[in-house]
């Protein structure tokens, strides 16, 4: 039951209510409060290096989250791949998931290494 493998280098910020399932996590992973990383039909996400999951966001099922990407507040990724260096965010008016290229890795601010070369 307690066999989730976490990366060597990660940061949990205000971790209350956060559930981290048996996904594959890359290093320099950042996760905030109220987040869920979980399975759908026994398939878990694969999360790259330097990924950030902000407050109340979720990644569920067979998803590949590319290096340096951010899952924005209250955004759910369900069995969807996110390219490296992109921000996934939900348009609260339409409920549509939007993907935007990111010039700066959000996780970079928390670690004293250049995540662009990891």
Predicted regions span which residues?
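Short "repeat-start/strand-capping" segments in structured domains, especially the N-termini
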Residues: 23-27, 83-84
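A generic structural motif
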Residues: 15, 24-26, 42
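Active-site-proximal segments of catalytic enzyme domains
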Residues: 28, 34, 50
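Extended, small-residue-rich solenoid/repeat segments and analogous flexible loops
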Residues: 1-21
């Amino acid at each position: 039951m307690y066999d989730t493998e976490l990366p060597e280098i990660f940061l949990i910020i205000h971790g209350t209510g956060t559930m981290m399932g048996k996904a594959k996590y890359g290093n320099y992973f950042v996760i905030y409060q109220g987040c869920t990383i979980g399975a759908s039909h026994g398939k878990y996400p694969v999360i790259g290096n330097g990924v950030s999951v902000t407050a109340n966001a979720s990644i569920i099922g067979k998803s590949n989250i590319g290096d340096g990407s951010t899952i924005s507040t209250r955004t759910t990724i369900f069995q969807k791949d996110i390219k490296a260096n992109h921000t996934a965010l939900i348009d609260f008016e339409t409920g549509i998931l939007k993907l935007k290229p990111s010039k700066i890795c959000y996780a970079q601010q928390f670690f004293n290494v250049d995540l662009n070369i990891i």
